[in-house]
UniProtKB/Swiss-Prot annotation:
UniProt protein name: Asparagine--tRNA ligase
UniProt keyword list: Aminoacyl-tRNA synthetase, ATP-binding, Cytoplasm, Ligase, Nucleotide-binding, Protein biosynthesis
Organism in which the protein naturally occurs: Lactococcus lactis subsp. lactis (strain IL1403)
GO molecular function, one term: asparagine-tRNA ligase activity
Known catalytic reactions: tRNA(Asn) + L-asparagine + ATP = L-asparaginyl-tRNA(Asn) + AMP + diphosphate + H(+)
CDD domains named among the record's database cross-references: AsnRS_cyto_like_N, AsxRS_core
Pfam families in UniProt: tRNA-synt_2 (PF00152), tRNA_anti-codon (PF01336)
Record SUPFAM superfamilies: Class II aaRS and biotin synthetases (SSF55681), Nucleic acid-binding proteins (SSF50249)
C-alpha cells in the first residue's frame, strides 16, 4: 500500500502520524497499557497502546473493544498499525509508536517458536519460521548488503556478469566432492565452481564475474561447511597473481564498507564490533608465503596459547592453523604460493619453483578461516594437458578448456569468494548455517 512506511524509516517521521504493516513479534502489558513488539522485515520496534486514547478516538464501546482485541493478540498476528512516531531514548532503536488505531489482517495460532530458548535442531526444523526472529532477520540483511556491494564493486570496476552453468560434464576441482545426476542416460554433475567457464568468458569479454549456487559433496559437519552455498567468482585477463591480490583486497574491503553503510541496524542487532570491521578496511591485508607460515607455526607450536598440531612443509593447514595465523596478524591474511600437490590442476607454477603454485587463500581473522581462494591460471597448453593427466582426469573432458590456450592465450587470474563464509565473518556469528536462508548440510535437506 502506498501509504505504508517501513519501520526502519520511522526516524524520518517523528511527530507524524504513520501507518505500518507488521507482525506482532511479542506483547506485554498491564492494566490500561499494552506494549507490542512489531517487526516488518526492516527492523523491530515498540508500539504502545493506551486504553484511554483508544476510547477518545473511537468512543467508549468501540475503543474498549479495540483495546481488548489488542490485549489478546497472539504472536505473529499480522496487523496494520496507525500511530504517532515518538523519540524514545530508552529504546535501542530510539523510537516508538503511540498507537491510535490497529487493524488485524491475519490471525496466528499456536506459533511454535515462542520467546524462550529453543534447541538448534528444533529451530532448523522450523527454519521457515526461525527466519522471522530478530537475529535471523539481521543475518539476512547482512547477506543482502554483501550481495549488493558485490554487484556495485564489479560494476564500478568494469566487470560483466557472466552466467556459468550449474550442470556440468566435468569437475573444476575435486572429483570426489561432486553430486552426480542422470542426464538423459549420461552422467552430469552439479557445479563446484563456475571458474572454468569464467575463463572462457574472460577471453571473450574481459573482466567477468559470476554469482550463483555451487555444490560440494563433502561429508563434513564443521561450522564452516555447507553442501550447497553461493559463490562470487571473478576472472580477469592480462592480470598477474600479485595484481589479482590487489583486486581481491579492494573487493573484500568494499563488501565490509557496504555492510557498514547499508546494514548498520543489522550489525547493531547482532552486537557486532564495528570498530574491528573498520580496522579491516583501514589496514592493509597481510601477505605471507605458505612456507613462511609453516615456519611461523613451527616456531610457536609450544606456546601456551596454541592448540594446533605440528605441521611440516608440504602439509595442508587445518582450521586451528588458519585461526592461529589470522589471529597472529590481526587482519585478513593472504597465504600465498601453496604446494602444487594439494591445489587445483589449473594453477600456474611459481617461476623457478614448480612445487609451488601462484595461488592464495584469504584467511579472515577472529577464527573465521578461508573466505577467498584464488590463483593465476596456467596459460601453456602442453603444461596444462600434463597437469590434467597427472591429476587422473580425462583430457577429453577438458578439450574445450584446453582450447582456450590455443587461441591467443594471455596471463589471467581470478578468485572465488564464499558468500556464506563472508556473511558469517562480517556478522560475527558462530555457525555458517545462519548465513543462508535454508541451509543444506550433510544431515539436513529440509525444509
Amino acid at each position: 500500500m502506498k501509504d505504508l512506511i517501513s519501520i526502519i524509516d520511522v526516524k524520518d517521521h517523528v511527530g507524524e502520524t504513520v501507518k505500518i504493516g507488521a507482525w506482532v513479534a511479542d506483547k506485554s502489558g498491564k492494566g490500561k497499557l499494552q506494549f507490542l513488539q512489531l517487526r516488518d522485515g526492516t527492523a523491530f520496534f515498540q508500539a504502545v497502546v493506551f486504553k484511554p486514547n483508544m476510547i477518545e478516538n473511537f468512543g467508549e464501546e468501540e475503543g474498549t473493544a479495540k483495546f481488548d482485541e489488542i490485549k489478546h493478540l497472539s504472536q505473529e498476528t499480522s496487523v496494520y498499525v496507525t500511530g504517532v512516531v515518538k523519540e524514545d531514548s530508552r529504546s535501542k532503536f530510539g523510537y516508538e509508536l503511540d498507537v491510535t488505531d490497529l487493524e488485524v489482517i491475519g490471525q496466528s495460532h499456536d506459533y511454535p517458536i515462542t520467546p524462550k530458548e529453543h534447541g538448534v535442531e528444533f529451530l532448523l526444523d522450523n527454519r521457515h519460521l526461525w527466519l522471522r526472529s530478530k537475529r535471523q532477520m539481521a543475518m539476512m540483511q547482512v547477506r543482502n548488503a554483501i550481495i549488493y556491494a558485490s554487484y556495485d564493486f564489479f560494476a564500478k570496476n568494469g566487470f560483466i556478469k557472466f552466467d556459468s552453468p550449474i550442470l556440468s560434464g566435468n569437475a573444476a576441482e575435486n572429483t570426489t566432492e561432486l553430486f552426480e545426476t542422470d542426464y538423459f542416460g549420461n552422467s552430469a554433475f552439479l557445479s563446484q565452481s563456475g571458474q572454468l567457464y569464467l575463463e572462457a568468458g574472460a577471453m571473450a569479454l574481459g573482466r567477468v564475474f559470476d554469482f550463483g549456487p555451487v555444490f560440494r559433496a563433502e561429508k563434513s559437519k564443521t561450522r564452516r561447511h555447507l553442501t550447497e552455498f553461493w559463490m562470487m567468482d571473478a576472472e580477469y585477463p592480462f592480470v598477474t597473481h600479485d595484481e589479482s591480490l590487489d583486486i581481491q583486497e579492494a573487493y573484500v574491503k568494499a563488501l565490509i564498507q557496504g555492510v557498514l553503510d547499508n546494514a548498520a541496524y543489522a550489525l547493531e542487532t547482532l552486537e557486532r564490533d564495528t570498530s574491528m570491521l573498520q580496522k579491516y578496511i583501514d589496514t592493509p591485508f597481510k601477505r605471507v608465503s605458505y612456507d613462511a607460515a609453516i615456519d611461523l607455526l613451527q616456531a610457536h607450536e609450544n606456546d601456551e596459547d596454541t592448540d594446533y598440531e605440528h605441521v611440516e612443509h608440504g602439509d595442508d593447514f587445518g582450521s586451528p592453523h588458519e585461526t592461529w595465523i589470522s589471529n597472529y596478524y590481526g587482519v585478513p591474511t593472504f597465504i600465498v604460493n601453496y604446494p602444487a600437490s594439494f591445489k587445483a590442476f589449473y594453477m600456474k607454477p611459481v617461476p623457478g619453483n614448480p612445487e609451488r603454485v601462484l595461488c592464495a587463500d584469504l584467511l579472515a581473522p577472529e577464527g573465521y578461516g578461508e573466505i577467498i581462494g584464488g590463483s593465476e591460471r596456467e596459460t601453456d597448453y602442453d603444461l596444462l594437458l600434463k597437469k590434467i593427466a597427472d591429476f587422473g582426469l580425462d583430457p577429453k573432458d577438458y578439450d574445450w578448456y584446453l582450447e582456450l590456450r590455443k587461441f591467443g592465450s594471455v596471463p589471467h587470474a581470478g578468485f572465488g569468494l564464499g558468500l556464506e563464509r563472508m556473511v558469517t565473518f562480517v556478522a560475527g556469528t558462530e555457525h555458517i548455517r545462519e548465513a543462508i536462508p535454508f541451509p543444506r548440510m550433510i544431515n539436513r535437506i529440509q525444509p
